[in-house]
Design a protein with these regions (language model features):
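Long compositionally biased, domain-poor regions of proteins
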Residues: 118-122, 146-152
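Single conserved hydrophobic/aromatic residue that forms the stacking wall/gate
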Residues: 2-12
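Short glycine-/aliphatic-rich beta-strand segments at the starts of folded cytosolic domains
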Residues: 89-96
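Short, surface-exposed ligand-recognition loops at beta-strand->loop->(often short) alpha-helix junctions
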Residues: 1, 96-108
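Short amphipathic alpha-helices within nucleic acid-binding modules
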Residues: 37-49, 149-161
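Short hydrophobic/aromatic beta-strand micro-patches
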Residues: 32-34, 96, 144-146
Length: 194
């Protein structure tokens, strides 16, 4: 059963395991679905909750949900590839906007940074995730940096140090938000429109 295929919608589905995380015992994995828009997300959810085959599959999962969070994800840039089978790395950082900075202002500056980074050879994808129902933290947004392969994150860090740190686009982000509490997850892309 595949909710994405049945709805004829583009979605990306990942199963990510915590790797660098402050509490590895808190959960075994994080299931991530990315939909093109809210209408597709909730059509997929309707199929998942109403379809007897989906319910039977859900009952067979080796784990129970401990938390489900609905989010809005603002795509900033894409990694080199999002093909199914890629073993990806995703780094999430909780961020609080500093006084006087709107989420839109931060987004626009981050888009400028990511565009410049990719024009200069960076292969990492970036998103801003705005948590909604089910979220119990106090972050204004979650900053996601993700790669098509685990090793690409290390290459991306070195590229940032040598090529991106001293750019005007990176300096424009300084002081807009405080981001910390980083966690890194790894896992396969299970389903992709590619």
């Amino acid at each position: 059963h595949d909710t994405c295929r049945r709805q004829r919608q583009m979605c990306i589905r990942d199963s990510l395991q915590p790797y660098f995380h402050r509490d590895l015992a808190s959960h075994d994995f994080m299931w991530v679905n990315n939909w093109p828009d809210s209408a597709a997300q909730f059509k997929g959810l309707e199929v998942w909750t109403k379809d007897p085959k989906a319910n039977a599959l859900f009952a067979k999962l080796p784990a129970k949900n401990s938390q489900v969070v609905s989010t809005v994800q603002w795509a900033i840039s894409q990694p080199r590839s999002t093909d199914a089978g890629n073993f990806i790395l995703a780094q999430y950082n909780s961020c609080k906007l500093n006084e006087g900075t709107s989420l839109r202002t931060y987004y626009d500056a981050y888009v400028d940074f990511a565009k410049m980074a990719q024009e200069n050879g960076d292969v990492q994808g970036r998103k801003l995730i705005i948590p909604g129902p089910g979220y119990d933290g106090d972050a204004d947004f979650i900053r996601l940096v993700y790669t098509s392969a685990v090793s690409e994150r290390g290459e991306g860090i070195e590229f940032w140090r040598s090529e991106l740190r001293d750019t005007d686009e990176r300096r424009a982000l300084v002081g807009m938000a405080d981001c910390g509490n980083g966690s890194i997850y790894v896992g396969p892309v299970l389903r992709s429109p590619n």
